[in-house]
């Protein structure tokens, strides 16, 4: 990891984890305006980035802890990722793994923080509670957790928000 970079600082502070969860959107400016008008803190206003493969618009908001969400609009872009990124040819790629979709991304929280984070997704994104479990549902002698799965309207995006529950060891 390159020292002094945003992701390098995040990993130094938190260990392995995710700094930013990006969402593909039809209109990044509208997504940013809507979420910030509902109380999200802006990290970066919508900005145009471009190269010879086209253009994209990105905007970022703060969520829980040091985690952010970036809205990515790639309507006029023909590259594999975003303008300015170059394809890397891997010698030993995982060809044929068959992965086509991410089912969910988990946001683990400290004890007592799960509900305020879920309230944030409901208020800022208009999401709803898809499913929830408590320590009676997910526990062993040594560990337990509570979880609320938040989802968007069509339930294509799901984000379980977890927090630890009492056990002989902490697991989350």
Identify the role of each PLM range.
Residues 1-45, 52-131, 139-172:
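Glyoxalase I/VOC metalloenzyme domain signal
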């Amino acid at each position: 990891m390159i020292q002094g970079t945003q992701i390098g600082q995040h990993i130094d502070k938190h260990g392995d984890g995710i700094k930013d969860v990006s969402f593909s959107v039809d209109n990044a400016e509208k997504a940013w305006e809507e979420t910030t008008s509902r109380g999200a803190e802006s990290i970066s206003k919508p900005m145009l980035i471009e190269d010879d493969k086209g253009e994209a618009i990105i905007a970022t908001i703060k969520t829980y802890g040091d985690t952010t969400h970036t809205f990515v609009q790639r309507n006029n872009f023909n590259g594999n990722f975003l303008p300015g990124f170059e394809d890397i040819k891997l010698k030993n790629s995982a060809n044929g793994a068959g992965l086509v979709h991410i089912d969910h991304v988990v946001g683990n929280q400290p004890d007592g923080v799960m509900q305020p984070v879920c309230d944030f997704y409901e208020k800022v994104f208009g999401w709803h509670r898809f499913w929830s479990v408590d320590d009676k549902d997910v526990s062993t002698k040594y560990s337990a957790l509570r979880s609320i799965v938040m989802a968007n309207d069509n339930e294509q995006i799901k984000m379980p928000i977890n927090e630890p529950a009492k056990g002989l060891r902490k697991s989350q």
